[in-house]
């Protein structure tokens, strides 16, 4: 194992599970795979409790998977800075902590971990210095990304091996763990993890009137009320099954991260949102549709289109148009002449080619290294170069 480093990761929760999920995944990988000593400072612990049942939102301080989790509520006057300080998603750092960083005998490296984007400007800004005002500290932007010259994506060392071992028996066991029997033969299985702004009702209508069974796994969360309203149902309890026509919606519990990976592997097509589930869908090497986090003035549209441009490169025109059209529909972007039903039919017809493409895409992304390892390399270079 390489030399252990010390890390402080600061996270303000904005996108509920997205920000917390990325920071927890990073902290956990640094600690478990690299043996680093990691503190995760987070202002709202409750999302972590949903992601890992060993974590308690009631505790101010706890240690899980060798990560020290601290509720970030006070000024942190007594906190001794780590060697590397990660400011997640521009959430800032406590002023007394910054002062302690500046006063340290060996000043820490301050990294601003930015949101994931495929936009063309990202490589030029990755690793760029951004000296903070009023204090003599080194601060750099660190961008996850999909190309050389970026920080890559979070990926655990054994992820692909776990994915490739996941077979029909494991899939059946997963469904039973989630409170349901395995879907029958001939069904298209779909997972949906979306914001409430997604046009889910239109897709439910399409699936219910389809020529073959569609089984939808819908976790507890922001999209579930849309489905309950469609069915006129009031009970959102996990284990419930809602049926209409060819459609079967299975309510599943909000699940730990490792179990969610298995759900992605068990489904034919995955609808994902934000950042963490978006990345996991790509590692799953299955067809997927991404709902970008909605931003003011449509800033998320540029992010979506930049990613789609990169992801769809090399696809034949049919599958390329299918994934573009479904992505626009799902993000409520104008797609003239395209309906949710027509977009879905085209996407479903392209499953085979999209699955092959997804496997090749995942391998290409893996060649960039992983985000945790690339962060450590960045720190080593800075230490070596003084």
Model-derived features: positions:
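Extreme N-terminal starter segment of soluble prokaryotic enzymes
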Residues: 2-8
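Short, glycine-rich nucleotide/cofactor-binding loops
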Residues: 9-20, 193-197, 269
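Active-site and donor-binding regions of nucleotide-sugar-utilizing enzymes
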Residues: 11-136, 221
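A donor-sugar binding/catalytic signature common to diverse glycosyltransferases
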Residues: 24-28, 254-303
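Hydrophobic/aromatic beta-strand patches that form the interior of the parallel beta-sheet core
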Residues: 39, 70, 86, 109-111, ...
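A nucleotide-sugar donor-handling region in carbohydrate enzymes
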Residues: 114-202
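Donor-nucleotide binding loops and adjacent catalytic segments primarily
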Residues: 182-261
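C-terminal amphipathic helix plus adjacent low-complexity
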Residues: 313-386
